[in-house]
Amino acid sequence: MERRFYYTRSIIYGWAVYDRQTNQPAWDACAELLPPVYEGKYGKITVDPCCETEYQAMRLCMKLNRANKEVTMK
């Protein structure tokens, strides 16, 4: 089974985690699958799929794939 999320370096976003379903950075998936970073004055603050380093992108990609697997198994 192919994993839904992958990470790569792009000219526009730098290191980013992408969703294979949309071929775009995984903004929606970060908001839906991962818990919010904190409940702010203007709502939930979620994780940004655009990362500074390859390591951060790899870790976020692993978290998203794990969360997606748990959701699809339910």
Question: Model-flagged regions — what are they?
Answer:
Residues M1-Y42, V47, E52-E54, M58-K74:
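Short N-terminal "domain-start" leader segments
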